[in-house]
Amino acid sequence: MNVIEILIVLGIILVSVILHELAHGVVAYFLGDRTAKEAGRLTLNPIKHIDPFMSILVPVLLFAMNAPVFGGAKPVPINTRNLKGKEWGMALVAIAGPLTNFLLALIFFLIGHFTGIIYNFNHSMFFFLRECVVINLGFMIFNLIPIPPLDGSRVLYALSPDGVRKFLAQMEIYGVFVVYFLILIFGNLFSGVMAAGVNGMLDFFLKLVGM
């Protein structure tokens, strides 16, 4: 891995996490919550969104270790009491982030497919397009893990009975430590599951275009 590749990956990561968080804020705004807008988070300004640890250090280290890349940005502030639909509104806000990463991955895959670049390892744009697809799929899958405070837990909360909702609410404080624990203690297993998820989505994309 050279300096140029690191800079390319870092650029893709920053754009991907910013659009992910921006999607949360935009959907919340249209569902009645102006918190993100009033906090100045409905912007493409990276300074407003970047978390040095989760937006830069973790993803770059994972890339350097040839592991599936994932990460995050500063969470967009959301006041669920302002949202239309309450729990279901929160689920829509939550799913907007991973859906954005899915759409970004699909768009770049289709660009690579129809230009033939993604099948030409020697093309100057191959690395860029491949990483756009793989990094966004990694972000999508990671954020769909149903452990608070990840987006998947918000969707699970909306779909669950009161007992599960209570458990998820209690986990909110400790959830981020659970995620870090799983990554640190079961790193190889976690990377394997992430890689399987990314490969499964790539197979799905290939089937979409008849490959």
Spans of model-derived segments:
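Hydrophobic transmembrane alpha-helices and their immediate loop junctions
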Residues: 1-211
